[in-house]
């Protein structure tokens, strides 16, 4: 019986946020760069999460559609569960700029795109690590 209860607790902790008691829609994980155990960030409401970072960006920088969003996030793209990749994917999509995108393993194209966007006066957001 104890094993069944322990398994139920594990399932519940993986499925429901312990603070809000809501079902988890997405679990993001840390990159583990600190050398410790990879941490988890459970999100119970993806719409709220997305609205939060979209409004935060708009508050400080303005409309995302005014920007070309370029991303160079190699180690983040190569693993699952990155909240940064999730946010940047959304920003790329919402920007609707044809040059917005990830520039993985193509630094030459990234450089040429940056030069062309600068020459045209296009507002550009480069996100990289």
Predicted feature locations:
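Nucleotide 5′-phosphate-binding alpha/beta core
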Residues: 1-29, 35-71, 93, 99, ...
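Short His-Asn-centered micro-motif
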Residues: 72-73, 127-129
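Conserved S/T- and glycine-rich ATP-binding loop of Class I adenylate-forming
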Residues: 30-33, 84, 126
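Ligand-binding cleft/hinge of the Venus flytrap
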Residues: 86-96
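Conserved coil-to-alpha-helix start sites within the AMP-binding
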Residues: 75-86
